């Protein structure tokens, strides 16, 4: 016969007291029970929980959006619906190269938290992840196994094919890792900057900018990467504050006629040679010198040094290291006297007089007030050159070597590469500077040289110093565009607010954007060069439109096919007679132009998917990227948008920036330092790094708990704290689930039918919901978790959970008090679901897997889908809450003080062994049983206060009501079931427990 689950009452009399105490009634208690595991299972997380909480939810809600949208008729209705119900956070595309690092996880998870919060607020989410697919790093990686000779001979089409495969592989790997982060999106339909539609959109943006007169080709100085062999934009530079150069003070002699003219202007007689003393930190550019600039507002001095005269700005004399007796000031004069003078550059010995020119850029901070000017190697120099008709001369090739055939014969021998006599020396080689300075010294033109530590631009890809070199490049004119851009961002919100200053300062300093690159893996600039005159370029709106249409038909690779020499196909019919004279340009666009055109993805969504003829403005609500993107993607998307539309409206409504990831020593994580931590190491754990396995939610918790607007720290110590915090949350969910399994009635009671302590607890839950919602709206995710942890520790663990256990475990399963507690627990569970779903979607999804279905069926307050459930609001009776704070909580506080006394005096260690008597002359708004539950005593009596209780502490409860409290050891026996000292006889059940057991037996 099968043994009965319950032990008959008469059997207890023959069982030992010890066994009775520990085991006899255990099966009659409603002990917590759930299959919700103590730890997450990564295999189940990846296979089941992430798809269910992420991709499936995203697709479902987007289908619902389209269904609702399809019911609307007018454009105004549709735009209003989009404004009210659609939330778009546009994904700045990560680069399709290499493995993902913690910074990628930081970026994607922050975006996901925002999207999931918006989903909880009843919004529909459109979030399309993207990848930035073109550019030099991918091209270099694709060609890394080839020799330099092979690379020189390989065709652009082959390079593109190899780069494409590399990008595709990188995207596949990165996508697989991104999917482990539980991101709310559809990974099957990302946007790629190498997609055909994307490329056509980008070419059309270029065409619109060209039609507005913003695109121009000029031979002017640009930053040039000698390692990567391409022009660079300002955004592709990083500055080394400790770069060391060899700087020099160099003398340039005035021509004889200019010497005479100056002496005449100054009213002096002189037979000594006069030299202009310049200072430079780039001696290699002296071969390209075309002028010396001065500032006509400065005071200059003519100094006698031994048997020669030196011209310098008066305030610079102290920098020359001269002793008082070593020089004589012949004359001080205004800079205007230098107008019209000429000097010679004896280093190149070309007998050509070079002018002294006024330049407002000349300052007295460094140097001598006389500035060596090489229009082919500097921005200010270039402007002076254009204004004065100087040659834009740059005898340096794409490898950063002197071009010997471009140099005068007199200097070719000294800058010839000794290892290869057909080539010039590398201009940045320290030995090159020494050779030039040695030559200057031989010519008696070197005053002195010294090592100079200063800030210098480096190529952010190769980490090598760049040069400034004049080459024919395509530029976007930003003089007017930046004013539109600045006007537009004055209406953009920034988080943190300092982002506005950073972005606007970068914008103000830009007058142009070099958009051409000399690489094969990119979007082509659709221009044509005359074969016989490479500087003669053919481009207009008609040609651009024709070429774009041809690319639509043949694909973009056709442009790079060097076997396709039929130019008639690429040019409109009216150019067919001369088409054979032209060839297609091989220049490609800056990759920042690529990613900066990504707002067209959102534009396509409106126009192609939603069939809208009128678009929302701005196009999307939020973009979120690292703080380095103020000079990158935030700027390029802003520029392309306002430049192509000619309207001062940014594509985004709000810009959010995050910091970088640091190790526990505060060092920025980098491969070169060897202190990086991969997201997978955090998810799976890494013994070598001392990292515990935190799972997907642990990675997300780590990111959410940080103040992401500054740099975030990650390492073993931080991970340990995250693991402990995550465990607390998980155990809280486990407690809730385990006490919701047993119930005869899964219907929630109305809040007004709950006990006062339950209503107070739900009021605190509502406060928590409101506070955390405010934090979410301000992107203070760390404060969300801090607030929740405080509530968990102080309101739940230390109070409500503690006082509810006796009712949950010992009361009849169908008792009103137990139903009241369970109703409260369901509301707590649902509130924690709402608060944590944006941060810990996997855990929340897992919780819902184990919640009894009865609590989910037909309930107004709780949704069957935890990711799409509403943000709860619990309507509290504030009068009851205030009364509870004034009555029960004040009594509880005094009880705790009195119990400490009882414990010290009589050794009572458990409140369940105490008896409480409340004396009062007033009616109290609670029952003795309710107060007993809160105090967790064995029993509470409420008696009439008399004058004999003066020795008892009096508690002022407000409104003239006061009570006295007596706490003493209970005179009754411990109940062997609930352990309260409330039984009339030893080893006998208390009345409450006897009724519960009898109910089970019936």
UniProtKB/Swiss-Prot annotation:
What's the family?
Belongs to the class-I aminoacyl-tRNA synthetase family.
Q: Biological process GO annotation list? A: isoleucyl-tRNA aminoacylation; mitochondrial translation
Q: Where does ATP bind?
A: 671
In the UniProt record, which is one GO cellular component term? mitochondrial matrix
Other remarks on this protein: Present with 1270 molecules/cell in log phase SD medium.
Lineage per the UniProt record: Eukaryota, Fungi, Dikarya, Ascomycota, Saccharomycotina
Q: Which domain of life is it from?
A: Eukaryota
UniProt-listed InterPro entries: aa-tRNA-synth_I_CS, aa-tRNA-synth_Ia, Anticodon_Ile_BEm, Ile-tRNA-ligase, Ile-tRNA_ligase, M/V/L/I-tRNA-synth_anticd-bd, Rossmann-like_a/b/a_fold, tRNAsynth_Ia_anticodon-bd
Which positions does the motif 'KMSKS' region occupy? 668-672
Q: Which organism is it from?
A: Saccharomyces cerevisiae (strain ATCC 204508 / S288c) (Baker's yeast)
One Pfam family from the UniProt entry?
A: tRNA-synt_1
Which UniProt key words apply to this protein?
A: Aminoacyl-tRNA synthetase, ATP-binding, Ligase, Mitochondrion, Nucleotide-binding, Protein biosynthesis
Major localization listed first in the record, in broad terms: mitochondrion
Coiled coil regions, renumbered to chain:
none
Protein name listed in UniProt: Isoleucine--tRNA ligase, mitochondrial
Q: Which PROSITE patterns does the annotation name?
A: AA_TRNA_LIGASE_I
One GO term in the molecular function aspect is: aminoacyl-tRNA deacylase activity
Localization per Swiss-Prot or TrEMBL: Mitochondrion matrix
- Enzyme Commission numbers on file: 6.1.1.5
UniProt motif 'HIGH' region: location: 94-104
PANTHER family named in the record: ISOLEUCINE--TRNA LIGASE, MITOCHONDRIAL, SOLEUCYL-TRNA SYNTHETASE
